[in-house]
């Protein structure tokens, strides 16, 4: 039992809580500095030569679960440990302190009052009414007053003692919500071309919400670099058969039916071309990482009734240019969407259009309401904690006509001392 008490005292100590907060902050910093949720091959490739912090290669990074910090075993362990520390501290310190503050303390001897931080004794006149005028004065100024014969106890700002337990409770809720969101939340990133839709299924396989991309635009600066991506969405709630139309862009997400939709990325979905007088043909585009980070393309097969041999088509923007390469890798021509036809051999190739696709990130986090509630409770508790709790005791000796006044305050003792003088003045008045 003795060792258990020591362990409990250690777990609920302020030093342990501070160390845990520092470790959690460092873990969060790692999660911010390192890309999260990517494929293992990406970490092995990117951190094999240029190591993270100069010592951590891709293999060690994966072993330490730094590719998913916030759902890693060690990060969740730190959050759980901090929660237990807060619970034990609340149960062992905050709750008894609150119960003690709620209970009235009855000082019966003048020497008990004289030992308080602020105290004073003075003689009153025989025709004075004793502590009754003081009781009325205190009640009129927002004090709670309790009188027993020639003794008076008063207190003000008791709600300030509720603040610390509320802060602890809010932090515990916040941690529970964050952990629940990590364990039960879902994340999905999809590329949608205009007029394409995505059905979001419930756990039992029923389609609850459908997301349709009605339009996608890329805002570019004069040099052609993308500045902003804008997706116009149609969201349909299948339960009530109702649709809403909203736009999302980078840093301007949308929350709908518990799902948050972010504008994440962009891509090129397809290209429509026409060879000579053939029908317009739409080809899907694939990303070609070997040629660069933002390069898409496709190998055009040999078309019937044409002397064209297979061509490699590449582009890096929906605006073009579109480059054609022969089987040998030699440049064969350059064109733009809705531009003049390109003559390759004896064939004319017209680029009708290039269809961009919007990268939409969907996040479902069931812990968000709990996190918001915990944050709100912590904020309210912090405001309450600012309020100082004042306590006052008065004992009147009938025979000697001596009145003893003493008080305590958990903060701003100098301010309470000034108020104390006003209370004494009220006794004379």
Curated annotation (Swiss-Prot):
It comes from the Bacteria. InterPro entries: Cyt_c_bgen_Ccs1/CcsB/ResB, ResB-like_domain. It is a multi-pass membrane protein. The chain crosses the membrane at residues 14-34, 72-92, 162-182. One of its GO terms (cellular component) is plasma membrane-derived thylakoid membrane. GO terms for biological process: cytochrome complex assembly. Belongs to the Ccs1/CcsB family. PANTHER family: CYTOCHROME C BIOGENESIS PROTEIN CCS1, CHLOROPLASTIC. Required during biogenesis of c-type cytochromes (cytochrome c6 and cytochrome f) at the step of heme attachment. May interact with CcsA. This is Cytochrome c biogenesis protein CcsB. It comes from Prochlorococcus marinus (strain SARG / CCMP1375 / SS120).
């Amino acid at each position: 039992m003795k060792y258990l008490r020591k362990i409990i005292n250690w777990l609920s100590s302020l030093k342990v809580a501070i160390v845990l907060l520092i470790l959690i902050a460092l873990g969060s910093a790692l999660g911010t500095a390192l890309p999260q949720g990517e494929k293992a091959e990406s970490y092995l490739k990117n951190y094999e030569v240029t190591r993270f912090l100069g010592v951590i290669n891709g293999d060690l990074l994966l072993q330490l679960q730094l590719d998913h910090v916030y759902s890693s075993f060690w990060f969740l362990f730190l959050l759980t440990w901090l929660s237990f520390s807060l619970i034990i501290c609340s149960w062992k310190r905050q709750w008894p302190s609150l119960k003690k503050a709620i209970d009235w303390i009855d000082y019966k001897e003048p020497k008990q009052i004289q030992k308080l931080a602020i105290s004073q004794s003075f003689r009153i006149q025989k025709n004075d009414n004793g502590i009754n005028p003081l009781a009325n004065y205190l009640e009129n100024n927002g004090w709670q007053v309790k009188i027993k014969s020639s003794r008076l106890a008063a207190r003000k700002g008791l709600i300030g003692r509720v603040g610390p337990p509320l802060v602890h409770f809010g932090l515990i809720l916040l941690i529970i919500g964050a952990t629940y969101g990590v364990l039960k939340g879902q994340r999905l990133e999809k590329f949608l071309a205009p007029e394409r839709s995505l059905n979001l299924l419930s756990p039992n396989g029923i389609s609850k919400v459908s997301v349709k991309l009605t339009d996608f635009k890329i805002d570019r600066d004069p040099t052609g670099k993308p500045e902003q991506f804008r997706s116009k969405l149609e969201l349909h709630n299948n339960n009530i058969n109702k649709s809403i139309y909203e736009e999302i862009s980078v840093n301007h997400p949308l929350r709908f039916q518990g799902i948050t939709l972010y504008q994440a990325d962009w891509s090129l979905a397809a290209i429509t071309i026409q060879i000579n007088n053939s029908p317009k043909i739409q080809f899907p585009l694939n990303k070609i990482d070997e040629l660069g980070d933002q390069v898409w393309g496709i190998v055009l097969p040999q078309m019937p009734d044409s002397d064209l041999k297979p061509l490699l088509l590449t582009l890096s923007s929906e605006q073009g240019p579109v480059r054609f390469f022969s089987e040998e890798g030699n440049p064969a021509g350059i064109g733009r969407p809705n531009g003049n036809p390109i003559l390759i051999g004896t064939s004319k190739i017209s680029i009708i259009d290039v269809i961009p696709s919007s990268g939409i990130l969907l996040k479902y986090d069931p812990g968000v309401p709990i996190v918001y509630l915990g944050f709100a409770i912590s904020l309210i508790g912090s405001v309450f904690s600012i309020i100082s709790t004042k306590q006052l005791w008065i004992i009147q000796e009938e025979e000697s006509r001596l009145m003893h006044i003493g008080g305590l305050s958990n903060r701003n003792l100098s301010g309470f001392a000034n108020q104390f003088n006003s209370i004494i003045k009220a006794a004379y008045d």
